[in-house]
C-alpha cells in the first residue's frame, strides 16, 4: 500500500511537471519578437521616435516624396509621413497600409527674409516653398489663395540655406514656407545673412484657426501601419503605438527627457545627421510652447473620424474613407 501511494504521488508530480513544461513552451511560443521596420521624415516627426535612435530598423529621410515611394512599394512595416501624402498613396496608388495615428498638428510657418521693403507678402514677391503638391504647398494655396509660389524645393532641409542666405539661384527671396524646428535654427543662427532682419511672418496653424475656428486644426505627420504586419503582429504594433503615445506625452511635458536621449546618442553633429536636428534645437522648440505642435491622436479615439474628415473636407475631400483607418 505504501508503494502504491509513492507511485501515485510520483505520477501526480510527473503530470504536474509536464503541465508546467507545456505552459512554459506555450508562453515562449506566444511571445512575438518581430522587429518593426520604420521610416520617418527628419525634423519634427522624428522627435516622436527618439527612443528608436539606436534602432537599426529605424530609417529617416529628408524628402517626404521618397518616403511615399517606399510606402507604395511596401518596404516598411511603419511609415510616418504627412496625412495627405499617406492617404493619397493608399487611395491612388493602392499602398497596403492603414492610418493609425497623427503626431504633429501644424508646424508650418512663413519666414520673411527681410528683403521685402514693405514686409507685406504679395503676389509679386519671390516666394519659395518645399514639397510641391504636398501638405505645405496645399496649405499655402488654401490659406493664401491669391498669392502663388515661385520656386519649389524638395524638402524642408533645402529651405534652410535659402532662408539663411535670402537667395536662390543668386536671386533675392522674400518669403519661405518653412517648418519648425528648422525655423528655430534659422532665426537663431548668427552666421545667417538674414540674422537680425529675418522674422516669422505667419503661423499656418494660427491662420487656419482664424479661418476655420479654434476647435479646428491642421493635421500633419501621421503613422501608417502595413496591413500584413498588423494581421501577423498586432500585439507588436499595438505596443509600438502605445509607446509612441507615451513617449510624445513625456517629451512635450518634460523636454529634458528628449534632450537626454539625443545627448546620449552622440555629438550635436551625429544627432543632426540622424534626425536633422540636435538637442539644442529640441530644447528651444519644445520649451517654446511646443512650437512643433507634437501630440498624439489615435484612430481609436472617439474624435478621430470627425477631426480627420473636417480637415480633409477643406484640403481634399476625395481622401475621406474610414476603411483606411486602423
What are these model-derived regions, one by one?
Residues 2-8:
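Sec-dependent signal peptide recognition
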Residues 14-17:
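C-terminal motif of bacterial Sec signal peptides marking the signal peptidase cleavage site
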Residues 19-21:
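Bacterial signal peptide processing site
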Residues 24-158, 167-175, 180, 191-196:
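Short, glycine-/small- and polar/acidic-enriched structural segments
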Residues 84-85, 163-261:
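Pocket-lining segment of extracytoplasmic ligand-binding domains
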Residues 122-125, 201-216, 291-302:
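Short, solvent-exposed loop/beta-turn-alpha elements that line the ligand-binding surface or hinge
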Residues 230-314:
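Secondary-structure end/capping motifs
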Amino acid at each position: 500500500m505504501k508503494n502504491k501511494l509513492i507511485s501515485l504521488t510520483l505520477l501526480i508530480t510527473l503530470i504536474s511537471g509536464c503541465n508546467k513544461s507545456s505552459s512554459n513552451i506555450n508562453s515562449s511560443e506566444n511571445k512575438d519578437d518581430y522587429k518593426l521596420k520604420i521610416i520617418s521624415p527628419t525634423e519634427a516627426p522624428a522627435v516622436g521616435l527618439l527612443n528608436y535612435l539606436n534602432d537599426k530598423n529605424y530609417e529617416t529621410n529628408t524628402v517626404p516624396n521618397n518616403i511615399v515611394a517606399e510606402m507604395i512599394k511596401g518596404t516598411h512595416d511603419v511609415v510616418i509621413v504627412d496625412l495627405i501624402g499617406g492617404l493619397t498613396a493608399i487611395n491612388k496608388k493602392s499602398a497596403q497600409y492603414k492610418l493609425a495615428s497623427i503626431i504633429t498638428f501644424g508646424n508650418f510657418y512663413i519666414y520673411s527674409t527681410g528683403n521685402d521693403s514693405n514686409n507685406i507678402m504679395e503676389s509679386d514677391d519671390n516666394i519659395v516653398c518645399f514639397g510641391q503638391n504636398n501638405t505645405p504647398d496645399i496649405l499655402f494655396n488654401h490659406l493664401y489663395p491669391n498669392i502663388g509660389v515661385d520656386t519649389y524645393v524638395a524638402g524642408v532641409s533645402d529651405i534652410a540655406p535659402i532662408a539663411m542666405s535670402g537667395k536662390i539661384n543668386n536671386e533675392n527671396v522674400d518669403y519661405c514656407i518653412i517648418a519648425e524646428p528648422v525655423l528655430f535654427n534659422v532665426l537663431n543662427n548668427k552666421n545667417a545673412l538674414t540674422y537680425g532682419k529675418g522674422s516669422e511672418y505667419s503661423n499656418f496653424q494660427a491662420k487656419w484657426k482664424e479661418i476655420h475656428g479654434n476647435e479646428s486644426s491642421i493635421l500633419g505627420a501621421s503613422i501608417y501601419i502595413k496591413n500584413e504586419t498588423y494581421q501577423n503582429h498586432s500585439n507588436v504594433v499595438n505596443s509600438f503605438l502605445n509607446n509612441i503615445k507615451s513617449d510624445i506625452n513625456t517629451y512635450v511635458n518634460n523636454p529634458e527627457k528628449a534632450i537626454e536621449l539625443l545627448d546620449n546618442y552622440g555629438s550635436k553633429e551625429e544627432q543632426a545627421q540622424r534626425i536633422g536636428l540636435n538637442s539644442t534645437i529640441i530644447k528651444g522648440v519644445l520649451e517654446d510652447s511646443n512650437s512643433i505642435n507634437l501630440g498624439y491622436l489615435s484612430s481609436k479615439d472617439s474624435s478621430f473620424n470627425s477631426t480627420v474628415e473636417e480637415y480633409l473636407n477643406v484640403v481634399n475631400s476625395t481622401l475621406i474613407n474610414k476603411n483606411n483607418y486602423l
